[in-house]
Amino acid sequence: MRTELVSESGDPDRANEDFASVALPASGRGGALVVLDGVTPPKDATGCRHSVHWFTARLGGALTELTVSLPDVPLADVLGRAIARTAEAHASTCDLSHPRTPQATVVLARWSAGAVEYLVLSDSALLVESPDGTVTARLDDRLARLPRSARATDAHIDARLRNKEGGFFTAAADPAVAARAVTGTLPREEVRALAALSDGAARWVERFGRGDWADCLALIREEGAGALVERVRELERTHRGRGKRHDDATVVYVEL
């Protein structure tokens, strides 16, 4: 088995709000990966005294533990338990009902001798390569399908779309959101490799159009996860457009 993990802040003067881990149980059977992309809030109040990176570290740590310690519990239930545990850690000091309470996108994958399970919530990506080289992107595209006019202001997004029916969902303080994730299970023999990408790394495909998902996974496999992040940084330096010029970028690659 080959595993590779790269996570880099979009700004060296700011904490990385992504989280990534790979867990290989002591039994030597199976494993799991976790990628979280913390949602950077506007500069006004969030109702929480904690930072986004505090939240992603807490949630990511809980997910890393629970995905391997509860191998028979479905990933959506694992996510719900991890959200509840994280919420409990700051419920007494923070307003968890605030729409901008710390939150994150989620990618989980867990493999055993017989199956590969996955979960995707919001706009990070999981690439699945089959033995014949076919690459399938497992995505939660609800945010991407919203018209740009509906995303014109943060206030409108928070009031009408964020963790709302007809909008999109992130992992914040409500465990019920876990049921909204895109989930599935594949036979282990149908999966050769996995690559989980935060949207800062997925920009190579989604924003800059330098290749498709198969090209992206081939780049990671042949040149390494760091090469993808480096290519994204080069493109960010030369392209200007909507959104953050530089974003935290995370890649976890696993060959089964």
List where the protein language model places each region.
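PP2C/PPM-type serine/threonine phosphatase catalytic domain
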Residues: 1-256
